[in-house]
Curated annotation (Swiss-Prot):
Residues 1-28, 89-103, 149-153, 208-225 are cytoplasmic. The gene is INSIG2. Phosphorylation at Ser-151 by PCK1 reduces binding to oxysterol, disrupting the interaction between INSIG2 and SCAP, thereby promoting nuclear translocation of SREBP proteins (SREBF1/SREBP1 or SREBF2/SREBP2) and subsequent transcription of downstream lipogenesis-related genes. It is a multi-pass membrane protein. Signal peptide: none annotated. InterPro entries: INSIG_fam. Changing residue 215 to A: Prevents degradation because of impaired ubiquitination. Interacts with SCAP; interaction is direct and only takes place in the presence of sterols; it prevents interaction between SCAP and the coat protein complex II (COPII). Associates with the SCAP-SREBP complex (composed of SCAP and SREBF1/SREBP1 or SREBF2/SREBP2); association is mediated via its interaction with SCAP and only takes place in the presence of sterols. Interacts with RNF139. Interacts with RNF145. One of its GO terms (biological process) is negative regulation of fatty acid biosynthetic process. The modification Cysteine sulfenic acid (-SOH) is found at residue 215. Binds oxysterols in a pocket within their transmembrane domains and interacts with SCAP via transmembrane domains 3 and 4. There is a cross-link at residue 215 (Glycyl cysteine thioester (Cys-Gly) (interchain with G-Cter in ubiquitin)). This is Insulin-induced gene 2 protein.
Length: 225
């Protein structure tokens, strides 16, 4: 009778949506898809904010922008977001430094809000010159890292992402793949690296939070075994 009772365990708790899948490869795919759509959504939202400065990659018409020549920009941002979001927890595991600072969704959402606020400031606040704009946004971006990350790997990846993304963007502009509508290209270059840095930190935090559920499932399974 005791054996019969042990063979019929109670209902298992599945937890969050990503925890209900036990395959690591499927978990990786789910996290990548989620990060991709988050990146696409943020790209569209931040582009709408930049319309105020007339430096957007899209035409002012929001509906027509989806079908414009720059339709590929949001998917590219989504792909980059997926890569960044998956890379951050992977680097943490390889370095043996699991990120434990402010690991909850409320902190992640505040990080997203601050990132959007930094982008909004670059579009709405008037600065005397481009140097003042660059220094202000750099301070805000580093403040975002210090408030929501504080990891050496996060800072290093953020700097690398900002440098690489800025170089790729400049190459695309110089080769005529697309161009900004603003005549003041120096203004665009003054805030671009800071936005990329803050975006890398933000997507890294989202990726870490999503990966945390997979770690919980693995720990629960090993404990049950």
């Amino acid at each position: 009778m005791a054996e019969g009772e042990t063979e019929s365990p109670g209902p298992k708790k599945c937890g969050p949506y990503i925890s209900s899948v036990t395959s690591q490869s499927v978990n990786l795919m789910i996290r990548g898809v989620v990060l991709f759509f988050i990146g696409v959504f943020l790209a569209l939202v931040l582009n709408l904010l930049q319309i105020q400065r007339n430096v957007t990659l899209f035409p002012p018409d929001v509906i027509a922008s989806i079908f414009s020549s720059a339709w590929w920009v949001p998917p590219c941002c989504g792909t980059a977001s997926a890569v960044i979001g998956l890379l951050y927890p992977c680097i943490d595991r390889h370095l043996g430094e699991p990120h434990k600072f402010k690991r909850e969704w409320s902190s992640v959402m505040r990080c997203v809000a601050v990132f959007v606020g930094i982008n909004h400031a670059s579009a709405k606040v008037d600065f005397d010159n481009n140097i003042q704009l660059s220094l202000t946004l750099a301070a805000l971006s580093i403040g975002l890292w210090w408030t929501f990350d504080r990891s050496r790997s996060g800072f290093g990846l953020g700097v690398g992402i900002a440098f690489l993304a800025t170089v790729v963007t400049q190459l695309l502009v110089y080769n005529g793949v697309y161009q900004y509508t603003s005549p003041d290209f120096l203004y665009v270059r003054s805030w671009l690296p800071c936005i990329f840095f803050a975006g890398g930190i933000t997507m890294g935090n989202i990726g870490r939070q999503l990966a945390m559920y997979e770690c919980k499932v693995i720990a629960e399974k090993s404990h049950q075994e």
